[in-house]
Amino acid sequence: MNIYKKLLIYLLLSMVVLAGCWDMVEIDRRLFVGIVGIDTSNEKEKYTFHFSIPIARQIISGEGGGGGKTVATVSTVGSSIVDGARNLALRLNRDLFFEHMRVVVIGEDAARGGLKNIINPLIRQTEFNRRSRIAICEGKAKKVMEINPWTEKLKSEYMESIYASVGLSGKFIELDLGDFLRGLHSQKGNTLVSKITPDKTEVNIGGAAVIKDFRLVG
């Protein structure tokens, strides 16, 4: 079992043990985001945010093995990831948690339009996991969120396994969110970041996306 999945199950079970008044219904009300996808929006100066969220009840009970969904992907529009998360929390009447976020995927159009408005909230807000992987997607980030891997139950678990295997080859830019943010700051908006290409059931991680003056240029 992937270490991320073990940690997630441990965290969920710990909540029940440490807070005896909690039950499964209360755990279901806490949404732990695994993957964030960011695309452009039809609304001016706003983005579409996609959140991949493990379904706690399915994972703990093991019902996912019988064909039940273990992950839900929900989307919302906002001026920033914080605004988008807030809008979604109000819509679903659930709280979103990003401490266990594993991957951030930025769509090609969003990256070409400029990264400052995307990354500034990630710099200011400490709840976002700085050890998350980050990549620029060829096309829409939504395509990554729609993949249906047959090798793993959780998309975030699948992405972690791909990063781990590709990392051994040295064929991509290996850096986490914290490295990416520090690199942009120290290089005045210029850096390299890994590139990801989605298919229906898998993703290909390889090569580098070139960021210049906070915009994707190649």
Name the predicted role of every residue range:
Residues 2-218:
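Membrane-proximal alpha-helical signals and transmembrane carboxylates
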